[in-house]
Structures are given as C-alpha cells and as structure tokens.
Amino acid sequence: MSTTKLDSIKDNALAAFKAAPSSKDLYDLKVQYLGKSGSLTEIMKEMASLPKEEKPLFGKKVNEVKQLLEAAYTEAEDALKKKEISAKMAAEEIDMTLPAFSQPKGTAHPVNIVVEEIFTVMSRLGYSIRTGPMIEKDYYNFEALNIPADHPARDMADTFFVDKTHVLRTHTSPIQIHSLENEELPLRVIGTGPVFRCDSDISHLPNFHQIEALCVDEKISMADLKGTISFFVREFFGPGLKTRFRPSYFPFTEPSAEVDCSCPICKGKGCSLCKQSGWIEIGGCGLVNPKVFQAAKIEYPKWQGFAFGFGVERMAIIKYGIEDIRLFPENDVRFLRQFVK
C-alpha cells in the first residue's frame, strides 16, 4: 500500500512540476511534496507500521523518489526562469516603428553667436583670440592706458572697485597691455569678455561684453584702421554697408574716432533703430597712443598700431533689430529660440 502511494506521489509531483505556470507556483508545489510537512515526509512516517524486513527497501525507494523529484524541480525551475526572462525581455523590447519623441533644440546665446561671427571674420585677417582677467589691477585698467589717477577720463566710467588696487575691468583694453608686454611683435590680437560698469537702462547694462582688436606693426596708419573696420562691417552686417569716422577722444588712442555704419535694418533709409538718421554708432577706434607703447616698453615710432572696440550686445542689437539690451541677461527662452543656428 505504501509503495503504491509513493508511486502515486511521484507521478503526481512530476506532472505538477512540469505543468507549473510560474516560479511561485512551482515553489508552492515543492513545499507540498518535498517540504517538512510535505507528502514524502508524511509517507515516511508509515515506515513504523511496516515489517522490519521491508523497512530498508521502502526507505531506499523513498530516497530515490525524493532525489528524482528534487532533480525534476530544479529542471522545471530553470525552464520557468528562462521562460520568464524571455517574456520580460519581449515586453521591454523597443518597438522601432513607434514615432520618436521630438526634443527641443538647444540654442546658442545671441552674445555667443555674435562673438563667434566676429572671431570668424577677424581670423581671416590673421587675428588671434585673447582673453584677460575680469578682476584687473588698477594699473592695467587705467594707468597703462594713459588714464592716471587724476585724469578726467576716469569720470567716463563708474567703476566697481574690489579693493584699492583692483577693479572689475571697465573695458577689454587691458588685454592690449598684457599682449604688448608678453608677446612678440608684430601682432594682431582680438580680445573679448565681460566688462563691468555702474550703469543700467534700456541701452546699458552693468555687465556686458566687449570686443577689442589690436594691430601692431612697423608701418601702421589710419588708412589701415579704416580699411580693416570697413571690411569687418561689410562681412559682419552684410555687403553694401558704408562706414564713417567722426573725430573723438580716447586716452589710449591718438587720433581717436567714433565709428558709424549705415543702418543694416533700413539700409540707410531711416528707421526706429537708427532714429531715422540712417546711421548707427558701433564703437570707437584710433591709433595706439605713444604713451601706451611707453607703458608696455615698446619702441615708438618703430612700432605703431591701431585699436578698435565694439560692444557685443550692441552689435547684436544692430544686426538683429533687438529693441532692449536688457533682454540679453534674462534668458527668456522665447527670446533665445529666435537665434537657433
């Protein structure tokens, strides 16, 4: 009777293991047949009622069935795990036919776009890019540029002083002095970076960006300066634009001039951007003052040079017809999206 019951347990367990739909169901069957209170454990208790001579044979058969069921369980467990992994992978498979999610395009800031375009134009003329410290010594920001402590030109810019001898640079002109002191002549450099002044309104920011170009060679004249700027204006704003030079004053250049170009928006006909004049001021320029060469220990008149500087935000305003300079630092995506390259 016990042998017949043992065979029945074996057959039922093998069939159940094979038919188990999941790993959890299979484990429950293992507990049912092979657990401490399972069917095999219960049938072992019946050995006590068997004759003494039958007990060894019956015990051996129970162990054989147990080993068989354990092997069958392991085989069924492996098969179910593979099946479940395959099902999971199939469920997670990427359907390449599904429509893709559109990603918004990143945009370069208009200031960076303008700087890159200026560098592209000037590099064609042999100019190399330079930068300088934003916290500058008073000497480089003023004195080396022919602006001593008692010079009235210091009133032209309200300055952020870090301490008695250091300032947040008010212009990028100090890059000229660093280049003259540290580089071999002749040289053509263009510097850029943020500058700082105590000023803020519709056309001024306390923190804005400048471009500063310097050319030094043995024979430099005002004609070279005018030709370079005229070429730059046409390449940057577009062909057909005119330039004009008005006498002005800067301590670090002599002679000095303000540079105007015909309005690229209205082509000189008159509009709100150029205030109906047809002309827009874009920056200042001049031949390098001999005192600047003297401060940098450069022999003059053997070496001569010219320099010019533009406000980057102003160049962007003129090129793109932007009405308020205060839009640049706000980082409003509605504004920035208009400049996707």
UniProtKB/Swiss-Prot annotation:
GO BP annotations, alphabetical order: phenylalanyl-tRNA aminoacylation
The keyword Nucleotide-binding appears for this protein: yes
Co-factor binding details: Binds 2 magnesium ions per tetramer.
CDD domains to which the protein is assigned, alphabetical: PheRS_alpha_core
Catalysed reactions, as listed in the record: tRNA(Phe) + L-phenylalanine + ATP = L-phenylalanyl-tRNA(Phe) + AMP + diphosphate + H(+)
Family: Belongs to the class-II aminoacyl-tRNA synthetase family. Phe-tRNA synthetase alpha subunit type 1 subfamily.
Protein name stated in the entry: Phenylalanine--tRNA ligase alpha subunit
